[in-house]
Each structure stands twice: as structure tokens, then as C-alpha cells.
Amino acid sequence: MTQFASPVLHSLLDTDAYKLHMQQAVFHHYYDVQVAAEFRCRGDDLLGIYADAIREQVDAMQHLRLQEDEFQWLSGLPFFKPDYLNWLREFRYNPAQVCVTNDNGKLNIRLTGPWREVIMWEVPLLAVISELVHHYRSPNAGVDQALDALESKLVDFTALTANLDMSRFHLMDFGTRRRFSREVQQAIVKRLQQESWFVGTSNYDLARRLALTPMGTQAHEWFQAHQQISPDLATSQRAALAAWLNEYPDQLGIALTDCITMDAFLRDFGIEFASRYQGLRHDSGDPVAWGEKAIAHYEKLGIDPLTKTLVFSDNLDLQKAVELYRHFASRVQLSFGIGTRLTCDIPQVKPLNIVIKLVECNGKPVAKLSDSPGKTICHDKAFVRALRKAFDLPQIRKAS
């Protein structure tokens, strides 16, 4: 299936902020590290028929480059350094790093190359896949239907929060990777800008063009890669946390907790890390149990939870965000990142549950175990066993 009308992507910055944040850290500290990443569809969708169309879009991405106005805008942000931005100015996507195949109806994608370059593929490639699939499956859906659905949800949201103090409710758009389309995401974000509780977007292109705050710190791959970068597997998570602070000592201080599991994370998150990091991000498992563990951990360390922020970003919608806000608002600072339920929330449209995750670093396996067993990713069962042993994990989790 080919012949999509035009390139889906129009800007190098049409990606999530944490990709550039991580890329700068990789550029400075792990310039020669090599990685491999693979696509997974967690649903039952057979997406192999779109392989040719995806390959065309991958080839078109080599023409994307950082424009002068984009360079100047990034230069005005407090956390990017000139050497990295000058390098990014010359960056071009290399389609040779991407292998796209149709395996009897199953879509297979494998990315290989230097981490500093491969890191850029995940978010825009997932956005391309999502937009292509929805273009063919739902040709008559689009911005109008998405905005109608959002307005309906906002009416319910207003009723749900009528008697709530919403002054500490902060919502972010995290919807780039599984959006219905670029146009839908932009329309949704522009509408949400009218709400006082909407504080920003993870999409750097939208943040620049709509004068929003870009949101994001690091992803699972940062912790996964350190499983092989660090000489000691048992201390790899601490090494990842320390390396992040080395690059960003006073900003971008939200740590992702579920690469190994929350319990394993908290064992590594001692007083120095807990004091220096601004807060934590939830991305799998029971959000209430996770939040209670986080608050208890801060209290045990003698840190006032109200000085820290918990970011919830796992499969959220507006109603779930309000429920979590009701539960936690008086005890800790809160932010909520909503993705698919904002940017692909259209009647009769089935969002794709798709990811691209790191599977190797320097030719050796890495794993994401998470707090939701269905999200576990690793080819090498022996490595998963070693990881469990290193982090003293009691529960055996099936690698997929």
C-alpha cells in the first residue's frame, strides 16, 4: 500500500521534547554508543500492509532539517548547549537505519545505529504509522470530529469539577506518537489553550508555533541503555539517574520510575536523588498505589511531598486525571499528561497501541520490565533473569 499524498512530517521538531533532551545527554556523554530498537503493536492489528507506505515516509524524512527560526527558538531555551544545537543543525535522518518489512501481515520495524541518531526515530515514526493507518481506515474522520468529541468531554469535565478547587490541576498534551493526524493534534492543543489548567505540550513543534511550554524529561530508553553502559547491572539505574543530573543539574528533573519496577526504583532513589530531582513520573501499574508509595518514600526521607511533583501519564483521560487529582491534590504537586485520549479520541476510530523500544545497547540485550507485565519487552530471557536477580525482584515476569 503506497501513494500517500505527501510527507506526513513537516518539521524536525515534530517530536516529543524528551527526545531532544535525551539526545543532548547522549551527544555529550555517550557519543559512540550503538543501539537497536524494535516496533511493537500491543494490539491485534495486522499493520504489515502499510509497510511500503511507511517506507516511503521514512525515505522522505531524510529531507527534514532544523530551520533557522527553529534553531533560534531552541537557542533561547535554558537547557540546550551551543555545541549540541550546532550539531543538531546538521542532523539528517538516515533511512538506512530503518528496516521495515511485512511479515505475513505483521509489521516489523528494526532501527539500528548510533544512539545519538537512532534516538530521533521513535516518536515521529510512530506518528507517521498512526496517521497513515487512520488515513486509510477512517478517511472521513478528522479535525471536526475530534473537536466535537473533545467539546463533549469538556462539558462532562466541567460538571465533574464544578465543586473542586482546580488551581493546582495541570494538564499537558502527550499525544504526538499515537495521534490521529498532525492536524488533529494541533487543533486539540489550540482548543485546550483556552483552558486555564492546560500548561503545555510534549511536542516541540507545537510548543514553538503556539507559544506553549515544552514538557518532558527522559524515557525508558535512558535507563535501559545504562543496563549495558554501566559496568554493574545492579547499579545501572543509579548510574542513569546520576548521569541525567550531570547533564541537567538544575532542570528537567522529573524521573521515570518503571523501567525496572517502582519498588526497585525507590530502593535506588535515596536522599540525594530524591532531594535533587523535582519529582517522579508514573507510566505503568496502579496509579494510586504508585502515588502512595512515592509520597511515603518522600516522607520516610524527611522530604515534604508538597515540594515535589508527581506526573501521571499512563493511559489517562480527563476523568481519570480528575479522580487522581481528588485523591492526591492536598498532599503533593500534580501534573497529568494525556496522549491518545486527546489526540486520537474520535468516535468509531480505534487508536493504535504501538511502541518502539530499545532492545540492544552495544550489541547486548536491554530490558524494560515495568509495573505492568504486559509492557515487558526483552528478547533475552537469561538477561531478564539476571536483571531480576540484580534488582532483587520477587516476581517472575514473562519477556515478550
From Swiss-Prot:
Q: Which GO cellular component term is one of those annotated?
A: cytosol
PTM info? Transiently phosphorylated on a His residue during the reaction cycle. Phosphorylation strongly increases the affinity for substrates and increases the rate of nicotinate D-ribonucleotide production. Dephosphorylation regenerates the low-affinity form of the enzyme, leading to product release.
Kindly state which keywords UniProt assigns to this record, in alphabetical order: Ligase, Phosphoprotein, Pyridine nucleotide biosynthesis
Reactions it catalyzes: nicotinate + 5-phospho-alpha-D-ribose 1-diphosphate + ATP + H2O = nicotinate beta-D-ribonucleotide + ADP + phosphate + diphosphate
Q: In which pathway does it act?
A: Cofactor biosynthesis; NAD(+) biosynthesis; nicotinate D-ribonucleotide from nicotinate: step 1/1
- BP-aspect Gene Ontology terms: NAD biosynthetic process via the salvage pathway
- EC numbers on record: 6.3.4.21
Top EC class per UniProt? ligase
Write down the InterPro entries for this protein, in alphabetical order. Answer: N/Namide_PRibTrfase (IPR041525), NAPRTase_N (IPR040727), Nic_PRibTrfase (IPR006406), Nic_PRibTrfase-Fam (IPR007229), Nicotinate_pribotase-like_C (IPR036068)
Single annotated GO MF? nicotinate phosphoribosyltransferase activity
Query: Positions modified as Phosphohistidine?
Result: H220
What is the top-level taxon of the source organism?
Bacteria
Q: Name one Pfam family in it.
A: NAPRTase
Tell me, what does this protein do in biology? Catalyzes the synthesis of beta-nicotinate D-ribonucleotide from nicotinate and 5-phospho-D-ribose 1-phosphate at the expense of ATP.
Q: Family per UniProt?
A: Belongs to the NAPRTase family.
> This chain belongs to which protein, by name?
Nicotinate phosphoribosyltransferase
Recite the lineage of the species: Bacteria, Pseudomonadati, Pseudomonadota, Gammaproteobacteria, Enterobacterales
